[in-house]
């Protein structure tokens, strides 16, 4: 009985595998769809480039556009419908002006007025962006000079303490004023003594003169 039960249970296992395969298949399909997306510039970008590169004054025709795109490696046959839709969209936006024909057929030119406005708008954005950054830098700069103000205030307070030694310099002036008075008196006394000596020296000259006169009188006699 056990063998028969084992044989009956074994065929029930295989049907579970196809369910797992069915779940995995849509994931692969999604991955394949992502890989099929075209890489590179879009049809509208290629059309604008080819029209801007052309030097024809009367505009570029649809046939000339297809030739230029095919020369650049674009598959025109597969993407013919995309090219027509892109041309119509560019005309409605105003990037291209239709010179001749209607719809996708005809000749097309770049709308220079719209290009000039776009260039001016981009230039204005570039000029406005640096102006917004300048006030932020100006606010940060005044914060740094606040610290040196504290240092200068402390330096201004410190020289006030240095004024105290001036009071100590006033005390030695008193003894200097007293000493020169005593010194001036002593030389005055010494100067009076030599006058008496001169008077004494002058007396013997008078005596010598009298003696000379007496000698002359005796000689006359």
Curated annotation (Swiss-Prot):
> Which terms does the record give in the GO molecular function aspect?
DNA binding; structural constituent of chromatin
Composition-biased stretches (Basic residues): 123-150, 158-221
The protein's matches in Pfam families, at most eight in alphabetical order, are given as:
Linker_histone (PF00538)
The GO biological-process annotations, alphabetized, read as: nucleosome assembly
Which compartments is it annotated to reside in?
Nucleus; Chromosome
Q: Where is this region: Disordered?
A: 1-44, 123-221
Keyword Membrane tagged: no
Q: Name one GO cellular component term.
A: nucleosome
Q: Where is the composition biased (Low complexity)?
A: 1-11, 27-44
**Any idea where the H15 domain is?**
39-112
- Gene3D superfamilies on file: Winged helix-like DNA-binding domain superfamily/Winged helix DNA-binding domain
UniProt xrefs under InterPro entries: H1/H5, Histone_H1/H5_H15, WH-like_DNA-bd_sf, WH_DNA-bd_sf
Q: Which terms are listed as keywords in the entry?
A: Chromosome, DNA-binding, Nucleus
Question: Its family?
Answer: Belongs to the histone H1/H5 family.
Q: What does this protein do?
A: Histones H1 are necessary for the condensation of nucleosome chains into higher-order structures.
What name has this protein been given in UniProt?
Histone H1C
Organism whose genome encodes this protein:
Xenopus laevis
Q: What is the lineage of its organism?
A: Eukaryota, Metazoa, Chordata, Craniata, Vertebrata
């Amino acid at each position: 009985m056990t063998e028969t039960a084992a044989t009956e249970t074994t065929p029930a296992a295989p049907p579970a595998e196809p369910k797992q395969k069915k779940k995995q298949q849509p994931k692969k399909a999604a991955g394949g769809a992502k890989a099929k997306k075209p890489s590179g510039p879009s049809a509208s970008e290629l059309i604008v480039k080819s029209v801007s590169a052309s030097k024809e004054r009367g505009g570029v025709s649809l046939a000339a556009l297809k030739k230029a795109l095919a020369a650049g490696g674009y598959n025109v046959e597969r993407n013919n419908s995309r090219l027509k839709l892109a041309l119509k969209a560019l005309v409605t936006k105003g990037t291209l002006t239709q010179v001749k024909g209607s719809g996708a057929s005809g000749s097309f030119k770049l709308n220079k007025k719209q290009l000039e406005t776009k260039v001016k708008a981009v230039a204005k954005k570039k000029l406005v962006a640096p102006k917004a950054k300048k006030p932020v830098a100006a606010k940060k700069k005044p914060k740094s000079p606040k610290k040196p103000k504290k240092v200068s205030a402390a330096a201004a307070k410190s020289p006030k303490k240095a004024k105290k030694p001036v009071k100590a310099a006033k005390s030695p002036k008193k003894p200097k004023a007293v000493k020169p008075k005593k010194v001036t008196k002593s030389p005055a006394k010494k100067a009076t003594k030599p006058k008496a000596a001169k008077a004494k020296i002058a007396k013997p000259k008078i005596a010598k003169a009298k003696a000379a006169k007496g000698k002359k009188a005796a000689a006359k006699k």
